[in-house]
């Protein structure tokens, strides 16, 4: 059963629209959990030491824009998809930025960093397998 107690309509996110401009804090729609997914309210996330080189284009990592910036971290489940059996809102979880396709292990990417090199990984990062981290920010309505 899908569960989304007090899930805000919007949340704040650090969004990169171009490597020629700095990222901006924007209000964006909060994702709703579908089958096989959850929404995580992030408590803490690491910052990669070479982040500036990624997001200013120095490293030439392929990624779609606009890009919600974020990597691995720890958070609490804010909502669960309709098929969740063990996961419950409020549970503490670790979010790994390394994402693999459920039906194709070669379709892999680093969330918020690199879309990978296969068509499958690009499809996942560009929306076929949406992932967006919801920061621990005050609720927006």
Locate predicted features.
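A glycine-rich, Thr/Ser-enriched phosphate-binding loop motif common to dinucleotide/cofactor-binding enzymes
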Residues: 126-141
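Ordered hydrophobic segments in well-structured contexts
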Residues: 12, 74, 92, 139-141
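Glycine-rich beta-strand-centered segment in the early N-terminal region that forms part
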Residues: 29-46, 58-125
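Eukaryotic N-terminal low-complexity, Ser/Thr- and Lys/Arg-rich leader segments
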Residues: 1-20
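Glycine-centered loop/turn positions within well-structured domains
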Residues: 21, 50, 85
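Cytochrome P450 core scaffold surrounding the K-helix E-X-X-R motif
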Residues: 49-56
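Short glycine/threonine/proline-enriched tight-turn/helix- or strand-capping micro-motif at secondary-structure
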Residues: 21-29
């Amino acid at each position: 059963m899908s569960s989304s107690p007090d899930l805000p309509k919007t949340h704040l996110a650090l969004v990169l629209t171009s490597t020629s401009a700095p990222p901006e804090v924007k209000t964006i729609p909060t994702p709703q959990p579908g089958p096989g997914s959850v929404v995580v309210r992030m408590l803490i996330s690491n910052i990669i030491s070479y982040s500036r080189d990624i997001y200013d284009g120095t490293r030439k990592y392929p990624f779609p824009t606009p890009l919600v910036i974020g990597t691995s971290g720890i958070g609490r489940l804010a909502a669960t998809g309709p098929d969740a059996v063990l996961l419950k809102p409020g549970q503490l979880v670790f979010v790994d930025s390394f994402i693999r396709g459920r039906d194709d292990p070669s379709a892999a990417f680093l969330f918020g960093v690199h879309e990978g090199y296969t068509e499958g990984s690009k499809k996942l990062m560009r929306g076929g397998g949406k992932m967006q981290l919801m920061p621990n920010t005050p609720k927006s309505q």
